Design a protein with these regions (language model features):
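Helix-rich interaction surfaces within compact, conserved domain-sized segments
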Residues: 90-98
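N-terminal pre-domain and mature-chain start segments
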Residues: 1-88, 101-131
């Protein structure tokens, strides 16, 4: 699924007044905490409030991980989680801590020594490898 297309459509609906800011700026407090503390900054400005800079937060879910997943604080920690022998699913979410906008940007499998894990490891949705 191309999450950016869905995102852009949702932003247009907000701009047209068909969807309210409160409908889309409803990030969970834990997601906002992760955004402030471990989010990877992007160069993009929030499409909703035009004030905040967006950050990317990654959550990793899989066997032998906490039920709420793990939110790696560094790229090295993310890479270590993605090299696990057990398969994991990674979710990259863009977040604006200023207005609580959030949107899933990418979901990909990793771990389990899959070809997809090697292909996806450390790449951002549109900017290539994460550094």
């Amino acid at each position: 699924m191309e999450y950016r297309i869905v995102r852009n459509g949702l932003v247009r609906e907000v701009e047209r007044g068909r969807v309210t800011h409160t409908d889309v700026c409803d990030a969970h407090p834990e997601l906002l905490r992760a955004a402030r503390n471990v989010g990877r900054p992007t160069k993009e400005v929030c499409p909703i409030c035009d004030d905040g800079r967006l950050v990317t937060v990654t959550f990793v879910f899989g066997a032998k991980l906490p039920p709420g997943g793990r939110c790696p604080g560094t790229v090295a920690e993310l890479k270590a989680l993605c090299r696990r022998p057990e398969p994991v699913l990674c979710y990259e979410v863009e977040v604006c801590a200023a207005c609580a906008w959030h949107h899933l940007m990418r979901k990909y499998p990793a771990g389990g020594e899959t070809k997809a894990a090697a292909k996806n490891l450390g790449k951002s949705p549109s900017k290539g490898p994460v550094r």
